[in-house]
Amino acid sequence: MGTSSGSNLPHQMLPPRQQLQTSLSLVSSDPHLSRSNSGIVRESPAESASSQETWPTSKSIMGRKTDSGKTGPDSHDQHVIRHVSIADKVSLRDIARERLDIVAERMHRLPEEYLEELKNGLKAILEGNGAQPIDEFMFLQKFVQTRSDLTSKTLVRAHRVQLEVLVVINTGIQAFLHPNINLSQSSLIEIFVYKRCRNIACQNELPADGCPCEICANRKGFCNLCMCVICNKFDFAVNTCRWIGCDVCSHWTHTDCAIRDGEISMGVSPKSVSGMGEMLFKCRACNHTSELLGWVKDVFQHCAPNWDRESLMKELDFVSRIFRGSEDTRGRKLFWKCEELMEKIKGGLAEATAAKLILMFFQEIELDSPKSLESGEGGGTIAPQDACNRIAEVVKETLRKMEIVGEEKTRMYKKARMGLEECEREVEEKAKQVAELQMERQKKKQQIEEVERIVRLKQAEAEMFQLKANEAKVEAERLERIVKAKKEKTEEEYASNYLKLRLSEAEAEKEYLFEKIKEQESGGNGGEASQAVMYSKIREMLHGYNASSPRVDPRSNQRNPFRSNP
């Protein structure tokens, strides 16, 4: 393995994959730029698909299917497309299917804006945001990969944008369309025909380092410097236990892939003298095994001081998963130590302290390793003075470690004490706040009781006023009945008096008429017949009036007609 303990040259003791670049920004035309890694640990996407290869994710695909109403980049800048004749237009399908030279000739006549729109359309398909579904990309890729006319000789005649589109369709990496990525045409051709690594941060010729192994020779586009032997994907994670390097062939494998495919298991290392079993990694490229404990120790010694909290947690998780099935003592201890440190980090332990503890643990298990058995194999007895010196060294080392542990525990005790004091101060502040809240609550309670008392008083007043209103209403109804009765009685008395008055007037008129009639009868015996008839009629009428006693409306102001005609 590239970093295993004591098994390689000093330059091989560096952190894994340190020769790789770690970001696309490192690819530059400036030859003086360093190709060393940045030391930044990035998350490995080996569990699914490599995010750096920019395959469209299932989430973006589903977003494209559920958002079919959106228009893709082909609908933008229509004023540019309108100036291109139908015969000169070129689509992605034309590039994937038509003859290379014919499409190249048509593309030379197209404006730059149209070519940029063509590239944006391919980007949108890869991202799952285009007007066409991701199935269109698979369709295009099938066309390109089944063509036999696309060779290094014919691709020389291709248009620059045409070549970029073909490379993107073939590899599925849209970074080749990025404006800041300016690879030469020969490099693009070599990537297309699998003669150069498709990882823009690597760009090594294939097979890398002239490796004659079966995988490098037969697997198209595989680069043993940056790609996983199992999944054939790459990422930019460095200084990490996410990648395992082979001690013999220096091929790399994702730790996740190795665990998933059973390439990490118990076994006896060929370099072990004691013959004891330990956790080994079996390289799929060369079938050689490499021990893992020394490799993990070297990675932590070189890289752990630079890891942040999240990175340290992930690395401890990787080591824990690697040694979960370990049956040897040191492997089990390492597994338990990683589990313990992860719990402590979750509980608030600083990452620097955790890194120191794991490094101290590696020193302890190195002292506990069966070196005495291996060094004493076939040898004679140890001299007493040498034995005493070794014992003294062991005691000194033990005392030194005890002092370090004691200092660490003292520091942790002081930190815990400070935390306790801080908690006590917080408790006191919270108690004051609780007392204030209780006082405020009591005050609010008194205010509520006062308001409730006022409400009850107002309710009593309202009930009293309602009672008085009811009594007044009853009294008003009683007075109304009295007034009505008196009014009826008054009207009856008025009508009676009025009738009596009219009756007396009628009697007076009747007497007056009788007197007049008698005078007429006594004074004019020889009157005219008509006058006699008239008097007889008046007499009959008066008799009829006396007989019938007519009722007269007391409210009427009209007089008896006899009064107006005496």
Swiss-Prot record:
PROSITE patterns: ZF_PHD_1. Residues 407-522 form a coiled coil. The keyword Zinc applies. It is found in: Nucleus; Nucleus, Nucleoplasm. Residues 64-79 have a biased composition (Basic and acidic residues). Induction: By auxin in the root elongation zone. A zinc finger (PHD-type) spans 225-289. It comes from the Eukaryota. Residues 1-10, 47-60, 555-566 have a biased composition (Polar residues). InterPro entries: OBE1-like_PHD, OBERON, Oberon-like_PHD, Oberon_cc, Znf_PHD. Self-interacts. Interacts with OBE2, OBE3 and OBE4. Binds to VPg of pea seed borne mosaic virus (PSbMV), turnip mosaic virus (TuMV) and lettuce mosaic virus (LMV), but not with VPg of tobacco etch virus (TEV), cowpea mosaic virus (CPMV), tomato black ring virus (TBRV) and grapevine fan leaf virus (GFLV). Interacts with RBL. This is Protein OBERON 1. It comes from Arabidopsis thaliana (Mouse-ear cress). The gene is OBE1.
